[in-house]
Structure formats: structure tokens, C-alpha cells
From Swiss-Prot:
Homodimer. Divalent metal cations. The best activity is observed with Co(2+), where the activity is 4 and 2.5 times greater than that with Mg(2+) and Mn(2+), respectively. Disulfide bonds: none annotated. It holds the Pfam family CTP_transf_like. Pathway: Cofactor biosynthesis; FAD biosynthesis; FAD from FMN: step 1/1. GO terms for biological process: FAD biosynthetic process; FMN metabolic process. This is FAD synthase.
Length: 149
């Protein structure tokens, strides 16, 4: 039986850190499904809308080699896609703080789901390993007039 792995994230301004977590997640199983956060959800969590619209982020993530399928998250219940997908493994990113591993296990157990939950510890092999760092660098260069519009 195929081992299904699920991970989730915003994936706004793709960078090597995103690719590394997806490669890691895929290495744990046979099928990788990625849940891409909805624009409205990102705004609630981060206080700002993503730069890239949700459907475009979903398409970009799905185009990446490790990913078998990318879907948009639920606007009602963040656990809904996980309950539908019934993964064997859930991979959490290093900066995902909505759930810690134990809380997520307890929540899913209420629905008789017992996936292995793995925390990806991060990727910092390049200077731009986060979308926020990329945005900060663009602003820095623009303010220093290194970028002309």
C-alpha cells in the first residue's frame, strides 16, 4: 500500500527552503500531497495577504518535481483536508506554529487518525531561505537604488 505524505504551507515567493522541505517530505513516502494556505487564512495568521494569489501558488507548488498533487486548504476548518486525505505521515515546517506535534496528534486522534508527525528542522544553506528574507532584500536594494523601476 502506498504511503501518503502531507505537508502544508503558504509557499509565497518560492525559494530553496520550500523545495528542501518538499524533497524531504517526498523521501518519507510514495505520494506527496501539499496543502496550500488560502489567501484569507494567511491574512488571519500573518496579518497580511500573500503577494502571490492562492491559485497561482497552488499551481507553482504542484509543478515542483517532488509534489504529486497540491490542493488549497479549507476556509472553514484547517484540519478538513487532512481528515479527507488520511495521510500516513504529516510533515510540519520549521516555522509552522499553528500546531505543535503533540497538539496535532491529539486533535487528529479525536477523528481516529494516527499519522506519524515529523518536523522538518529547516534549511539555511543559502542567504534567501525564507520569503520574508527575500522581501527584505528587495526592499533594501530598492531603497539603496540598486533596483530601478
Amino acid at each position: 500500500m502506498k504511503k501518503r505524505v502531507v505537508t502544508a504551507g503558504t509557499f509565497d515567493i518560492l525559494h530553496p527552503g520550500h523545495y528542501e522541505i518538499l524533497k524531504f517530505a517526498k523521501s518519507l513516502g510514495d505520494e506527496l500531497i501539499v496543502i496550500v494556505a488560502r489567501d484569507e487564512t494567511v491574512k488571519k495568521l500573518k496579518g497580511r495577504k500573500p503577494i502571490i494569489p492562492e491559485e497561482q501558488r497552488r499551481e507553482m507548488v504542484e509543478a515542483l518535481k517532488p509534489v504529486d498533487k497540491a490542493i488549497l486548504g479549507s476556509l472553514k476548518n484547517k484540519l478538513e483536508p487532512i481528515l479527507e486525505l488520511k495521510p500516513d505521515i504529516i510533515v510540519l515546517g520549521p516555522d509552522q506554529t499553528t500546531f505543535d506535534e503533540e497538539t496535532l496528534k491529539k486533535e487528529l486522534a479525536k477523528y481516529n487518525l494516527y499519522p506519524e508527525i515529523v518536523r522538518f528542522r529547516g534549511y539555511k544553506k543559502c542567504p534567501f531561505h525564507s520569503s520574508f528574507d527575500i522581501v527584505k532584500e528587495i526592499i533594501r536594494r530598492f531603497c539603496n537604488k540598486e533596483i530601478k523601476i
